[in-house]
Amino acid sequence: LTPVAPDALAETYGGGGGAFGRHFDAILQARRRESDEFYAGVIPKSLDADATNVMRQALAGMLWSKQYFYYDVNRWLEERGCDPYLPSAKRAPRNEQWHHMYTSDVISMPDKWEYPWFAAWDLAFHVLPLTLVDVDFGKQQLDLMLSENYLHPNGQIPAYEWNFSDVNPPVHPWATIYTYRLEAALRGKGDTEWLERSFQKLLLNFTWWLNRKDRAGKNAFEGGFLGLDNIGVFDRSSPLPTGGYLEQADGTAWMALFSLNMLEMAIELSLQDRTHADMVLKFIQHFVSIASATVHAGGNTGMWDEEDGFFYDVLRLPDGQAQRLKVRSMVGLLPLCAVTVFEGGFQEKFPEIAKKFQGFLEARPELKTFIHDPTRMGHAGRRLGAILDEVKLRRVLEKMLDENEFLSPHGIRSLSRFHAEHPYVFNVGGQEYRVPYLPGESDTGMFGGNSNWRGPIWVPVNALIIRGLLQYYAYYGNEFTVECPTGSGRQMNLYQVAEEISGRIASLFLRGKDGRRPVNGGEQKLQEDPHWRDYVQFYEYFHGDHGAGLGASHQTGWTGFIARGLHLFATTTAEQVLELGKGAAFEEVNPQEAGSGTNPAPR
C-alpha cells in the first residue's frame, strides 16, 4: 500500500487518522481504484454484476494462491541416509529417485491452506485463468516443470511432493500451446523461441511415456494414478490384487491428446522453420496409432464396448485372459476430449508430408477404419484428429448428456448416477471391490480419503470436455446436433452443448432465482448473511447432485477455470468459432458486443 515503514507512517504522513496515519484511507482508495480499472479491462462488460463478482474473485484467488516453495530434495534425502550412489539398508520414505530436484520458486499452489505444495497437472489448469491477467507468470510456471531443477533426466515431470514419481495426466503440452496462442493474440506475435524450447523438453517427456507406460508396445497405455484418485475399482497406484495390469482408457486418451498437442506445436514451428516438418509426420503417426488402439486394441476385450457404446479400463491377467471393468466414469469420457481441429492449408504448404502420411495410411488401412478419418474435410476445409468417429461420438454424448447418468444440474459428474442403483462389484481372492455412486465425500481412505472421484463434479475435466466439444463444433458445424439433455427432445449443436455445460458449472457459484449459491450448500450464514453471501469460495470438487462445495475450500487453483469459462462464452460466439476455428477463443473483441450477453446460468 505504501513504501513507508510502519514506524515511520506518522512522521511521513502526519498524525491522526488511526494507526496508519491520516493519509491511509486515501492510499487504500487509490489502490482500490487502480484494481477496479485493471479488472474492468479483463472482465467482459456483458457479464452481469454477480458473474462479474465471481470472475473477479476467482482471478483474485488465483493470484492469492502464489507461494514461495523451497525444497532441496538431495539434502532432505541425505538427512534420511539415502545416498544416490551407494545402496542403503535404510529406504527413504519417498522421492529417492529425485536427488537432482531443487526448488526455490514462487509457484501457483492448489490451495495454500490444505495443499501447500505444487501438483503438475493442477498447475497446467492454473495457467488458463492466470494468463487472463499475467501471461508472463503463466509461461514461467510452465517453464519451471520443464527446467533442469524439476524435470527428471529420464523425461518424467514431477507429479507432487508426496510422490514425485507418481504419474499425473500429461496436460502440460495442452497448456503450452494454449498459452502460446493466447500470447500471440494479445501481443500480435507468438513467442516461437519459448515454444521451441518447451517442445524440445516435452519430447523427452513424450518418450518417457512411450517407454514406461506402454507395456505391450501396442499403444494401449497404463499410467496408474493419473490424478483421478479413487475413480477405479482398484488403487491404480498399487499392484493389482489379481496380478497382471490395467490398460487404461484415460491413460491412452491422455497420450492421444499429448500427440495432438505436440502435432500442433510441430506445425506451428514448421511454419517458421521447415526442419520441424518431420516432427509433424511423427506425431500424426503417433496419434493415429494410439487413437486406433483406444478403439480396437484387444478386439472383443478392447477398451471400446460396442454394446454399451462406452470406453472402459481393461484388466489383463497373467494367464492371458482379459476383462473390461464396466464402470461408467470420467475414464470413459476422456477419449472424447482427445480431439483437435486443424485448419486447411497445411497440406498445400507441405505436400511432401501429406504424401508420406497418405502412404502411411495406405500401408495401414485398418487404422483409419476404427477412428475418425483424419483425411476427411469438414467445415471450412478443416480436418479433425479424433478418437471418436461421428457414430461413436453420438453414443458417448448420449450417456454424457443424460441427467440420469453424467449430466448434473451443475456440470458433468465424475461417475454415472447409474451406479447409485447398480454399483459395480468385482470379486477376487475372497474380497469384494465395489464402486458405488457417491455424489458427496469419499467413504474410503484411499488417497487420504479427502477427495472423491466417484460421483462429484470436478471443474478441470469439465474444462477439457468443453474444449473438446468446441473442437468438434469447429469441424462439424451446425448440422451436427444432439439431444441435450438426453430424452428432452431439445436439439443443440455442439457449441450450444459446450455453453450449456459451462453455464451449469457457473451456476455452482452464481445466485439462483432463490438468491442462494449452490456452492454454499446448507450453510445459512454463507447463504443469507449480507457480510458473507457475496464472498465465494472455490472448492476442490462439488456434490454431484446439489453442487455443495467439498474438499479443500480455497482451491481456487483448477476451480479458478471458472474465470476462463465465464470469459470464453461472453467473448466468443458460435459464428466466430465457425469462421475462425479454435482461434476464436483468443480473438480480442469488445466484451459489450461479444457472445450472447446472457447470464451464464443454465438455460
Each predicted region: which residue ranges?
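Acidic, mature catalytic/reactive cores of soluble proteins
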Residues: L1-R603
